[in-house]
């Protein structure tokens, strides 16, 4: 069946086609050949009749082949046609996308897809020159999420130190958590023992830094405790004076530091006091040199 169809198409393609002669050429030939011979006329008539017969035969063969092909196509079942259509290669997604881009405007297609997906506009709006204004697309997707009432971010809080519970009493807190000081002391002792037994230098340096951090924290806590004690002592004295009818005197920050230093180093004598004063002098001098401009620092 398929062979008959292919044969019909081949015969149709191989059919001889005669070119038509224009009227001007016929007139010129007739004028040039004023007296043709009878034999020439007979030959021409015979040739034209033979050509017409060949054309008629070709037309009959083509019509017969077309009828055979239509009959063969009618006899094919729908299942076979469906299978043939399924086996045909379908265009891939990439080819269809490229076809869309080539047919339509890529700029508008990108905008539509980005607007549909709710994404940011990824196009590069470059300026023609540095003096030209920057071009920005106004076709951006609007978020469906709306904040009618702004909700504050939930912060991590400790209910023990909330203002609703009243002012924080540091003395009471220190008294309640006084057992932590003993824990820290035991931990420092164990850390010192571990440093002494450790052979690895890197691990030893790490443990030493941890011990130094704990010792500095201990000194800071002791200094703060001393400052609170000095301030509490001054407040008690002022309360007694207020009972006697005198006006209260509130210490400034600088005065508080001065009293803490006097109370801390007032008991020291001789070389201990000189050593502490020299250490504090170097500390203050280092801070001043650090804050000094580089040019003046080099001159000094």
Curated annotation (Swiss-Prot):
It comes from Botryotinia fuckeliana (strain B05.10). Residues 181-244 form a coiled coil. The gene is rrp36. Associates with 90S and pre-40S pre-ribosomal particles. This is rRNA biogenesis protein rrp36. It comes from the Eukaryota. Pfam families: RRP36 (PF06102). Residues 1-169, 280-300 are annotated as: Disordered. Component of the 90S pre-ribosome involved in the maturation of rRNAs. Required for early cleavages of the pre-RNAs in the 40S ribosomal subunit maturation pathway. One of its GO terms (cellular component) is 90S preribosome. Residues 50-69 have a biased composition (Acidic residues). Belongs to the RRP36 family. Keywords: Coiled coil, Nucleus, Ribonucleoprotein, Ribosome biogenesis, rRNA processing.
């Amino acid at each position: 069946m398929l062979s008959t169809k292919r044969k019909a198409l081949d015969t149709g393609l191989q059919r001889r086609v005669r070119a038509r002669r224009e009227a001007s050429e016929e007139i010129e030939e007739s004028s040039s050949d004023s007296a043709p011979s009878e034999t020439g006329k007979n030959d021409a008539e015979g040739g034209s009749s033979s050509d017409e017969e060949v054309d008629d035969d070709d037309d009959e063969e083509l019509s017969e082949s077309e009828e055979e092909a239509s009959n063969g196509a009618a006899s094919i079942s729908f299942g076979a046609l469906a299978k043939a259509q399924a086996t045909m290669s379908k265009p891939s997604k990439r080819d269809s996308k490229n076809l869309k881009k080539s047919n339509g405007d890529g700029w508008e297609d990108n905008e539509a897809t980005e607007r549909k997906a709710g994404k940011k506009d990824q196009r590069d709006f470059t300026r023609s020159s540095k003096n030209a204004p920057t071009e920005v697309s106004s076709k951006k997707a609007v978020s469906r999420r709306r904040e009618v009432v702004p909700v504050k971010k939930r912060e991590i809080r400790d209910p023990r130190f909330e203002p609703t519970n009243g002012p924080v009493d540091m003395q009471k807190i220190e008294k309640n958590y006084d057992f932590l000081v003993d824990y820290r002391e035991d931990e420092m002792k164990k850390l010192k023992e571990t440093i002494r037994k450790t052979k690895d230098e890197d691990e030893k340096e790490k443990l030493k830094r941890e011990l130094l951090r704990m010792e500095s924290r201990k000194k800071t806590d002791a200094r703060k405790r001393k400052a609170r004690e000095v301030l509490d002592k001054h407040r008690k004295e002022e309360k007694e004076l207020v009972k006697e009818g005198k006006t209260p005197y509130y210490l400034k920050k600088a005065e508080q530091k001065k009293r803490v230093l006097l109370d801390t180093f007032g008991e020291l004598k001789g070389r201990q006091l000189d050593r502490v004063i020299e250490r504090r002098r170097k500390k203050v001098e280092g801070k001043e040199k650090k804050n000094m401009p580089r040019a003046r620092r080099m001159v000094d």
